[in-house]
């Protein structure tokens, strides 16, 4: 497995945003970025054997910094909406950031999609990790999260999320990739 990483842009506060390419021996590859622990490219063979990117996304990493659709992002602390931006655990009510009407969506403005994650190479992929302190976005508990992306010689990608916290809290992580199985530049209505 060949893994390449390079800095492509910086956040407004100067943190480097990197692109990681994980390529197998057939030339198929996956790309990720530490901005939101995102999966940004899935270049795999089509039925004729030609490589095609089947993920919908942006042309540059700078575009992901402005993304409002969570393209390829690791979403958390809580994927989906929490009604009225609040919940109760053990008779204590927690008030969250409001970012979707009266609700909290995908962890609010402080969600995992809007963070620069730490990273390390794995033999067959990339591990991203993030620390979210107690009270961030209104959520209780210090939490350490990991997202592993592993790619194999059969062109299979495994995505695994792990979380560890020091108190009762809500956690519901997911990956928010969008697919066009026809490949870039083709109409999604041509899926077969």
Predicted regions and their residues:
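An exposed, glycine/acidic-rich loop-and-rim segment of catalytic or binding clefts
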Residues: 1-192
